[in-house]
Amino acid sequence: MAEGQTLPPFRLLPMKAPDIEMTRAEGGTIYVTPRQAPGDRPKTVPHCLDERAAEHPDRPFLREKDPATGEWQTLTYGEAKSITDSLAQAFLDMGAGPDAPVMILSGNSTRAAMVILAAQKIGAPAAPISVPYSLMSTDYEKLKHCFAAVKPAVIFAEQYEPFRKAISALNSDACHIFSAEPAGENSVRTYDDLVATEPTDAVASAMAKLDDGSIAKYLFTSGSTGMPKPVPTTQGAMCAMIGGQEGLRDDARDPEYDPDLIPNVLDWLPWNHISGSNVNFNGAIWNGATFWIDDGKPTPALFQRTIDNIRDCSPSSFGTAPIALAMLADAMEADDTLLAAFFKNMRSIGYGGATLSDDLYDRLQALAIKATGRRIPIITMYGATETQGITVVHWEAERVGLIGLPLPGMTLKLVPNGAKLEVRVKGPSVMPGYLNSPAKNAEVFDEEGYYCLGDAVTFVDENHPEKGLVFDGRVGEDFKLSSGTWVSVGTLRPDFVAACSPLIFDAVIAGQDKDYAAVMVWPSQAVMEQYVKIAGGDKARAMKTFTDEIAHKARAFNAGEPGSSRRLKRLLVLTEPPSIDAGEITDKGYVNQRLVIDRRADLVSRIYSEPLADGVVQL
């Protein structure tokens, strides 16, 4: 937006204004608590499903594209109740229960949703596993670790053949295995066979025993700091997050709110993480929404599917990673029909997983103004597998980078840690502790019972805390240069990546105990493919062009950074992609800064070698 330009108003966000209480303790610790009380919430998620099925049995609940025809297939709330009752009975017959989970190896689908909800109905924890552990791994070590941790009674893989090797790597002889497709093995049953099971009173009896302490899922941490850790996610934790959001809800604030409009949610985020499963999917059930399963992803090969799906459903809310929003902005700037479809019902845009750049924020607002005449609220929620959602931006923010303020029911404890404020949290959505990990649990909870996230935050304005909190990096990722100057990786890294967009996929910052900071970057696959095409297939020439371009952007970044803690003096382009087996990257696309630096110590040494090594660029 041009400086001094008068901007149109926001579409009003249907949420209450910030109202928090801040208490200071001895030693500089700050406690932050919202004054709003939690709102309504369901008894459990399965109870919520059954209630919605009774209220509107014929309303579309799930929509998923048939991979063969490309046509949308619809499952109603009433059908979902019937199917989950039948599957729940089948799981009981197979011996599933509170101590015998149901493991899901395949990704988001209507059938996977039914399996997850059916398991919860009988108190059997659902354990959705990151798909790359089965399909992208070569040693299956993380998959075997997850299997050994939860000891499932039942395993589901939608298509058996792609998962055959992964399942064979498990000690699964005692497990019941089923798939949507005939597997050619007598021991593997079909999904349709289980759906044909006649439910008995045992399902209702098991469901009646569910309470806040019932474990709904085992969600595994992303493995970005070692092997994935199993997090018991209770019904109480999931429903408390719904209650926290309801405590902020104020539909009357939006004069255009139509209570008869069925919300449309379009989402690709994997259900083995809280954002896709506990925030978006559970929230859709609570709101009686229609959940469109997005078969696209923010990659050059798959994002067109997301664009096509937006045209079909005109979602009322849309949340994704900033990289996907950048791709969407590119598409909408070139296509007014897509622009109109996207903003037709849109009430807010959400993002997470990385910082949204000022440039992308401005582009999205310009598109919103073009389509609607107003700006759109762009919000985010901050949390972790262990805590569910902790904070949310619940007002029309004029800036990016905020993580918001705590949800009703949650209390933040901000503890001085060097020059930063380390964030800790307590509340009903925080896990009771990792499964069978007493030593680890003793490490992650402090003396007051607050969970320690390892992140740092800062106030936008400490004199006006209602303006919100800003993410200030990981406490353990920051390092000192030889001069004693601290380098804040958590802010430098995303700022550099944003400045170099769209050339790079990600970057890591090196320099601990060195005289200066340096950077290693991964090229964007789409950009490199374009450079190779321009170079007539000459990959070496394409790499030189890329290196020259990224060096130019890096020098421009340095020009605006006067301090040594923010200036990068050398650059190396990485050719080996981040390894999921080694834990360098998760299925969410999060790159583990510390692990990459440790695993590629030889490259770090090369960056700092004298004279300048081949491939290293002096900035």
Report residues per predicted region.
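Conserved AMP-binding/adenylate-forming core of the ANL superfamily
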Residues: 37, 58, 62-114, 134-144, ...
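Conserved AMP-binding A3 loop
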Residues: 73-78, 207-210, 216-243
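Conserved AMP-binding/adenylation subdomain of ANL enzymes
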Residues: 239-264, 271-319, 325-336
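Structural core segment of the AMP-binding/adenylate-forming
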Residues: 2-15, 122-193
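Conserved ATP-binding/catalytic segment of the ANL
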Residues: 421-481, 616
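Conserved structural elements of the adenylate-forming
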Residues: 81-87, 196-203, 212, 231-257
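Conserved pre-ATP/AMP-binding loop-to-beta segment of ANL
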Residues: 57-60, 179, 185-189, 193-220, ...
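Gly/Ser/Thr-rich phosphate-binding loop
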Residues: 287-289, 307, 315-319, 329-400, ...
